[in-house]
């Protein structure tokens, strides 16, 4: 299990083109290095047993129950099942994610049907993905996705931290307290680094999008699913 600290920012056409030029090496940003970009297509389907956000919260349903079909560079389709618990801190997501590959997706769809789950909503994402380093923060790996989601353009950047990084040299209650303090400190530092990162592209981190994808796609302020 790991923590995702993630920021997403809406882009204009010109901003999208600029970020694309940078990750494809047509433009340069001082202090930034990027891996070769991969072309992604993701189709996500979200499931729930309830009809409202209040019901979901009352019954403790995970924030995200998702099936994802994904291709990378037009290669074979891979499918993943994901459960995610989400927290929003200063409009930046801090998520705990559990994910497994699925060799036969039909098994999961039968499970959903027989267990009383229904599809909540879906989204499609066309993206370019790469890993980036800032010279000022060489120990951080920034996973960048430049994306079009249901016809709108976005930049998503995440830092992934492993909980195991905080589990050394302590035990029991002290270990739990130390791990929580370390996690909060790491989250705060990672949020700052994400804001520094998007500034490299002349983007304003105050424009970070606090809404879920469900709210963005449907225009709804209720029944948050992702």
Each language-model region and where it sits:
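N-terminal strand-loop-strand beta-hairpin
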Residues: 1-139, 164, 203-226
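Intrinsic-disorder/low-complexity detector
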Residues: 170-171, 176-181, 185
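Charged, well-structured binding/catalytic surfaces in domain cores that contact anionic ligands
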Residues: 129-156
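Long, contiguous binding/interaction regions
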Residues: 73-76, 110, 148-159, 163-166, ...
């Amino acid at each position: 299990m790991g923590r995702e600290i993630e920021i997403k920012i809406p882009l204009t056409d010109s901003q999208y083109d600029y970020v694309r030029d940078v990750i494809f090496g047509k433009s340069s940003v001082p202090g930034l290095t990027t891996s070769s970009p991969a072309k992604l297509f993701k189709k996500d389907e979200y499931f729930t047993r309830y009809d409202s956000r209040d019901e979901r919260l009352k019954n403790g349903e995970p924030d995200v129950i998702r099936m994802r079909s994904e291709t990378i560079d037009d290669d074979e389709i891979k499918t993943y099942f994901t459960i995610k618990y989400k927290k929003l801190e200063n409009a930046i997501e801090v998520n705990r994610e559990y994910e497994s590959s699925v060799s036969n997706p039909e098994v999961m769809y039968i499970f959903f049907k027989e267990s009383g789950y229904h599809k909540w909503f879906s989204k499609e994402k066309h993206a370019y993905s790469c890993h980036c380093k800032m010279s000022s923060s060489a120990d951080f790996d920034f996973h960048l996705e430049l994306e079009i989601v249901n016809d709108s353009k976005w930049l998503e950047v995440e830092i992934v931290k492993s909980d195991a990084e905080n589990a050394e040299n302590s035990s029991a209650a002290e270990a739990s307290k130390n791990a929580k303090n370390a996690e909060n400190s790491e989250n705060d530092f990672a949020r700052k680094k994400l804001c520094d990162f998007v500034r490299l592209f002349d983007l304003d981190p105050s424009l970070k999008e606090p809404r879920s994808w469900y709210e963005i796609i449907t225009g709804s302020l209720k029944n948050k699913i992702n």
